[in-house]
Amino acid sequence: MAGKRTRKINEGVDPTKLYALTQAIGMVKERAVAKFDETIEVSMNLGVDPRHADQMVRGVVNLPNGTGRTVRVAVFARGAKADEAKAAGADVVGAEDLVEIVQGGKIEFDRCIATPDMMPLVGRLGKVLGPRGMMPNPKVGTVTMDVAGAVKASKGGAVEFRVEKAGIVHAGIGKASFDAKALEENIRAFADAVIKAKPAGAKGNYVKRVAISSTMGPGVKIEVGSVTAAPTA
């Protein structure tokens, strides 16, 4: 039964062909037939080797149409900054007490923000938050004194990205229920951010391949030039 369903979903998708972005979005949306609102993910293969420090790609992008998911935000802060975080809508706010909770294995948040003075304390959580990609980092705006702005950005569609070992960077950029225009705008915003994050050590062709897929659907390869007009080399 599952095999038949998979074959039917895959019908019409040529794994050797590159599709225009708008066509690819339509194909992915048509095949997102699960009983839940599937996440649409974009994947980019980059011409970098992240084992070298000068070829690391990472950053954050605010998607114009949000991600469609509820993001739970934790903030490490004290005093007025803790109050600011709560007023901005942070789900969890604390200092030493929150560190103890996280060390105990209770992680009820998706994104973590800290004020700079809290980092010596938060640094103890590296082994817990690091592997989950949740360690606060000034490069992506999660170590900041503007906690209200960071909380609102996180809840409003901010997406962090970081290249993996094979030179791949990917992210969920929306839901199957989004209209095609919203998905296109989000994909272009993500691709633009990745291109702007091109490291000094990257040589030759930077964006090699781009593909999109839904949670349960097949990957659809896209013509790189149809995703962004920015140079890919």
Curated annotation (Swiss-Prot):
Coiled coil: none annotated. Binds directly to 23S rRNA. The L1 stalk is quite mobile in the ribosome, and is involved in E site tRNA release. Protein L1 is also a translational repressor protein, it controls the translation of the L11 operon by binding to its mRNA. Part of the 50S ribosomal subunit. It comes from Rhizobium etli (strain CIAT 652). This is Large ribosomal subunit protein uL1. Keywords: Repressor, Ribonucleoprotein, Ribosomal protein, RNA-binding, rRNA-binding, Translation regulation, tRNA-binding. One of its GO terms (cellular component) is cytosolic large ribosomal subunit. PANTHER family: 54S RIBOSOMAL PROTEIN L1, MITOCHONDRIAL, LARGE RIBOSOMAL SUBUNIT PROTEIN UL1M. GO terms for biological process: regulation of translation; translation. The gene is rplA. InterPro entries: Ribosom_uL1_bac-type (IPR005878), Ribosomal_uL1 (IPR002143), Ribosomal_uL1-like (IPR023674), Ribosomal_uL1/biogenesis (IPR028364), Ribosomal_uL1_3-a/b-sand (IPR016095), Ribosomal_uL1_CS (IPR023673). Belongs to the universal ribosomal protein uL1 family.
